């Protein structure tokens, strides 16, 4: 609901009577809150504001703010807590658990699909269809989203955990969260941690549970969790086994594991020399086991450069400063015992979850319209037709407005109806200063062309089943370029995938498999919050097949396809 910017209608301090009514409504809506907690949430004397706003879908929403943070919002006479409130009182709603990678999808406006739900040993929370519920991530009880259950718990289990689980209304990092102090979720330990004895029983029964899964039987949704435990144990020591180690030693082990995993499964000889920052950002982070987070500052090395110096001393890699202040890995000994003895883990449960979700939601190309915004100096021309500064119009609408304006003001030349006389308003809108006293008439096509040229470009992108997204400026096409790296090696670089609803990481994974070439996802230079995909070699032919044939994007939105290798040439 708040994935896109909203428009504030009013912001006023709450009245005393309204404050008392709100306290009563909160008591009725959230019976798990005690009297003291309600007094903390809605204090008697501290400032409390009521904000009326319109979300991008047009719904009217009332938001209650305290201390600069939104604490509650009301939609269709129903009260909902924000993530700020849930961080203070995490147990007032039934909570579903999901993987950290799913959060990005939720922030982008997606609902929580059941394949992405992690089932704890105690089973799913008991909800009925339409019940308010929260969503938290594995390892942290602090909710990151709220929504309403799309089906009851019984229906979820009966469906085999397929389909939509929670219709999401508000998330951490959405625009409602941004209206507050933008704090991050606190670390809240999960309730009822698994007993160590029980964990041993679980590990002993994993083989039986796996066979039960193959037979299609699940009881209380416990199998996926134990499969996850099995998967984690194959890649890294379990959390229970690590509890005896200091945190710094745990992070050292995790850092080495991610490093060896990246070298053995992701980095190829053709990638060298490889920036150390790229090794960390594009390879090591993605090799981190589920439920764990790689943080070099918590290791004994503190910095990546010190860790790589240690790896160089062990003669696993060779690091050089090829340009001032920028280190690169120039050589890797793939025969080193550390690398050869490392066992690559099985695909994680999360990657399977992402694949299931993507299968349920296949990519469909968006509908794209070119639009024009009314600038300040052309406001008078569009005022009579009910449009003001900033209004967006299609080209056909602009043509009709200009035509109607000329006819209504009798500006069509009587002797030559292909010409339009320019009145003061048209002169100010379309003529240059040196033309003001020289040009008195223009042909229709020239008049319309000049009007469109002087208006500000915009575009509207509409994905199937979603609200239109309106953006000002020119629509950037998907940009495919070839670049030469060290030793005259070619790489294919793709930018602007996000504009068309394409996930750069997903595209990189597909290209890596089809082209049998290494890929790197990195921040796009000069573009805020945008990523680029780099593929080893000239892979434009494969890209063209993927974008044009499978994703069915129109060719006019893709530039650089002509650089594909010609048939018969390598």
Swiss-Prot record:
Domain PUA: 93-173
UniProt GO BP: formation of translation preinitiation complex; IRES-dependent viral translational initiation; ribosome disassembly
Residues the record lists as Phosphoserine modifications: 238, 241, 348
One MF term in the entry's GO annotations: RNA binding
An annotated GO cellular component: cytosol
Endoplasmic reticulum recorded as keyword: no
Domain SWIB/MDM2: 370-454
Primary subcellular site in the record, as a coarse category: cytoplasm
Chain spans, region Disordered: 224-245
SMART domains found in the cross-reference section: PUA
A Pfam family the protein falls into: WH_eIF2D
InterPro entries xrefs: EIF2D, eIF2D_N, eIF2D_SUI1, Pre-PUA, PUA, PUA-like_sf, PUA_eIF2d-like, SUI1
PROSITE patterns in the record: PUA (PS50890), SUI1 (PS50296), SWIB_MDM2 (PS51925)
UniProt entry keywords in alphabetical sequence: Acetylation, Cytoplasm, Initiation factor, Phosphoprotein, Protein biosynthesis
Compartments where located: Cytoplasm
Positions of modified residues (N-acetylmethionine): 1
Sequence ranges assigned to domain SUI1 in this UniProt record: 478-548
Keyword Acetylation found: yes
PANTHER family, A to Z: EUKARYOTIC TRANSLATION INITIATION FACTOR 2D
Role description: Translation initiation factor that is able to deliver tRNA to the P-site of the eukaryotic ribosome in a GTP-independent manner. The binding of Met-tRNA(I) occurs after the AUG codon finds its position in the P-site of 40S ribosomes, the situation that takes place during initiation complex formation on some specific RNAs. Its activity in tRNA binding with 40S subunits does not require the presence of the aminoacyl moiety. Possesses the unique ability to deliver non-Met (elongator) tRNAs into the P-site of the 40S subunit.
Family: Belongs to the eIF2D family.
Protein name stated in the entry: Eukaryotic translation initiation factor 2D
Species: Mus musculus
Organism classification: Eukaryota, Metazoa, Chordata, Craniata, Vertebrata
Gene name per UniProt: Eif2d
């Amino acid at each position: 609901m708040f994935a896109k910017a909203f428009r504030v209608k009013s912001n006023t301090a709450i009245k005393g009577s309204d404050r008392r009514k709100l306290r009563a409504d909160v008591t009725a809506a959230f019976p798990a809150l005690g009297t003291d907690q309600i007094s903390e949430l809605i204090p008697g004397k501290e400032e409390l504001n009521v904000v009326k706003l319109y979300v991008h879908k047009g719904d009217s929403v009332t938001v209650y703010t305290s201390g600069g943070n939104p604490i509650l919002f009301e939609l269709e006479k129903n009260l909902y807590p924000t993530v700020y409130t849930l961080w203070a009182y995490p147990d007032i709603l039934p909570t579903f658990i999901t993987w950290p990678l799913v959060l990005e999808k939720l922030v982008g406006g997606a609902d929580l699909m059941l394949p992405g739900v992690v089932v704890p040993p105690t089973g799913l929370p008991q909800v009925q269809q339409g019940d308010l519920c929260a969503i938290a991530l594995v390892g942290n009880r602090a909710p990151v989203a709220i929504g309403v259950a799309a089906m009851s718990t019984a229906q979820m289990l009966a469906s085999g955990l397929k389909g939509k689980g929670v219709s999401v209304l508000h998330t951490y990092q959405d625009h409602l969260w941004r209206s507050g102090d933008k704090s991050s979720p606190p670390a809240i330990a999960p309730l009822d941690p698994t007993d160590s004895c029980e964990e041993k029983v679980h590990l002993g029964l994993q083989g039986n549970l796996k066979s039960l899964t193959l037979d299609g039987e699940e009881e209380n949704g416990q199998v996926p969790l134990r499969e996850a435990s099995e998967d984690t144990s194959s890649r890294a020591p379990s959390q229970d086994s690590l509890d005896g180690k200091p945190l710094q030693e745990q992070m050292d082990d995790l850092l080495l594991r991610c490093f060896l995993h990246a070298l053995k499964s992701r980095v190829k000889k053709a990638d060298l020399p490889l920036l150390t920052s790229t090794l960390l950002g594009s390879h090591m982070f993605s090799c981190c086991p589920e439920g764990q987070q790689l943080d070099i500052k918590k290791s004994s090395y503190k910095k990546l450069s010190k860790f790589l110096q240690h790896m160089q001393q062990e003669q696993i890699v060779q690091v050089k400063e090829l340009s001032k202040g920028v280190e690169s890995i120039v050589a890797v000994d793939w025969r080193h015992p550390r690398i050869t003895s490392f066992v690559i883990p099985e695909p994680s449960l999360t990657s399977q979850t992402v694949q299931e979700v993507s299968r349920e939601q296949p990519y469909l190309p968006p509908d794209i319209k070119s639009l024009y915004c009314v600038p300040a100096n052309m406001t008078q021309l569009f005022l009579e037709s009910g449009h003001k500064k900033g209004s967006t119009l299609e080209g056909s609408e602009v043509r009709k407005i200009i035509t109607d304006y000329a006819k209504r003001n009798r500006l069509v030349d009587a002797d030559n109806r292909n010409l339009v006389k320019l009145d003061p308003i048209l002169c100010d809108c379309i003529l240059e200063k040196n033309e003001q006293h020289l040009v008195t008439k223009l042909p229709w096509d020239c008049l319309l062309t000049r009007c469109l040229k002087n208006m500000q470009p915009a575009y509207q992108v509409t994905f199937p089943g979603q609200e239109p997204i309106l953006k000002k400026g020119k629509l950037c096409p998907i940009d495919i370029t070839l670049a030469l790296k060290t030793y005259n090696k070619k790489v294919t670089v793709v930018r602007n995938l996000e504009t068309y609803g394409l996930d750069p990481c997903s595209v990189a994974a597909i290209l890596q498999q089809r082209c049998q070439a290494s890929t790197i996802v990195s921040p796009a230079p000069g573009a805020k919050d945008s990523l680029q995909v780099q593929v080893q070699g000239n892979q434009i032919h494969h890209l063209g097949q993927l974008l044009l044939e499978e994703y069915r994007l129109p060719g006019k939105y893709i530039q650089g396809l002509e650089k594909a290798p010609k048939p018969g040439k390598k």
